[in-house]
């Protein structure tokens, strides 16, 4: 396992614990529930976004495995059928075993007999289409990693407005206790936004790199399968 993979897995597994570790001093006097309550509506919204992010991470961590995108047993079976020139049977497998590999390979099989250029174009088009679909699945993580800090910043501004309103309403004589609520909300929402954004960003990078690597490897396998249809140069 390389360093990048190890860091990605660690970020995904440790994401739920970051909130607990982010403010140990606060945790000594307030529970996590108390901190969330003090952060107000925006804090709860950030927590909701974090739950969505965790669900997306888990779902993609499972479905973007290489064995899911390009099942080795299916690859070997189709390779054997290609060697026996049983292309119709290979097409049936592609239709019955949905995956990135079978979708792209099936597009090429459907154009056998139309010339290598047509086959190659069909494979490239389906490969692009499937790649976009996979990118869309993890694009939510990129969105969340950008939105969460902005939500935290919004909470910060809201909290500071409350603090200054307290000063204004007291004629400039607001006590520290009166200011504490607004300032606390300002700091907590910023913290929650960053606590969500950091592991989500790491998870997005890990899943994206895994997906790109698998797409490249699968493309090489498919290219090798259809190489037999390439006309020999004179």
Q: Where are the regions a protein language model picked out?
A:
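Hydrophobic membrane-targeting segments
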Residues: 13, 24-73, 207
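Membrane-helix interfacial "entry" motifs
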Residues: 5-6, 30, 36-40, 129, ...
